[in-house]
Amino acid sequence: MRILLTGGSGFIGSHAAEAMLGRGWEVWCAVRRTSSRRFLGDSRLHLLETDFEDEAAMEAALQSLRFDAVVHAAGATKCVRKSDFHRHNTLLTARLVSVLQRLALRDGASECESRLPRFVFLSSLSAINSIEGEALGKPTAYGASKREAEKIVEACRLPWVILRPTGVYGPRERDYLMMVQTLCRHIDFAAGFSPQHITFVYVTDVVQAIMRAVEGKAEDVTGHIFTLSDGETYTSRDFSRLIAGELSALKGSRHRVLRVTAPLFVLRAVCRCGDIFMRVTGKAVTLNNDKYNILSQRDWRCDISASRRLLGFRPEVKLAEGVRRTVRWYRQNGWI
């Protein structure tokens, strides 16, 4: 099977590339000239350098290749300007879909729909502003850009599958790394006094879903949006407690932490400072006003029953084991 993968230099994409190569697939990874190659060193991987901002350049890079499936995992999770989310997440998706449709039609795929490559789009739970009819809170620029990208995918002629993972963690992930680093400094910080229900999914389980979306029977998977989590609901303290426990295991003695709970306005102030820093330096940071709307949301519960039933999704890594693997990887690779 020949696959086009975008976002292969990123957290989820690099894990997906490894799994695809392990399956014996021919993987073509579309990368920017400036993309890191740190996790793309496997000699079996075909790197396809292109400019995602230039539709003509994308078409030129892809015109001689034909793919069985396209996995679109590229995008931005933090940006200096909110408009950049639209540019990196929505417009990039629109260009890619446009190029793929045009090339497929040029090859006569309009006469044989089975020749159209399956398009698997990695979205986010943030793309929706309600779960089971309940308002999630203020929408984010990131989530809005992902939802607009979903609409583009839903309207295209390609057979599509959309995946909406909740909070994804695991080796190579950098946002949750901040929390681990804070706990390494013996501080367990939480914002907001009302209970917060959160969900997680380990990176290899997201990759499992990607593989199933590529390989699944068309009548079961195409034209569907699948939510991904490990099937459990946690609190933020559950997550920090497991991290502290793993830090204790690594050092061979109890890793003591000071629990600090601050009002949400403190987190808001920190995130506003992050916005000011971004405007001054031009560098994106994790804590910003858009991220505040995600962090302050108190309920991220989700239903994965359709993913189990139609996609055959079976989350294998629960939070305790996932945290153990992640923290040990951070330590072994000098990230903490």
Regions found by a protein language model. Name each.
Residues T50-R95, L125-E134:
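NAD(P)H-binding glycine-rich loop region in Rossmannoid oxidoreductase-like domains
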Residues V203, I225, V270-R314:
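Conserved C-terminal active-site "lid" loop/helix of NAD(P)H-dependent oxidoreductases
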Residues G216-T286, A320, R324-R325:
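Mid/C-terminal beta-alpha module of Rossmann-like enzyme folds, strongest
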Residues I3-R23:
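N-terminal Rossmann NAD(P)H-binding glycine-rich loop of SDR-like oxidoreductase domains
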Residues C302-L310, R314-I336:
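Amphipathic terminal alpha-helices
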Residues A94-A141, V161:
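Conserved Rossmann-fold NAD(P)-dependent oxidoreductase catalytic core, especially the SDR/UDP-sugar
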Residues R174-M178, G192-E215, G223-T227, S236-R241:
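Substrate-positioning beta->alpha
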Residues E150-P171:
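Conserved beta-loop-beta element that borders a ligand/cofactor-binding pocket
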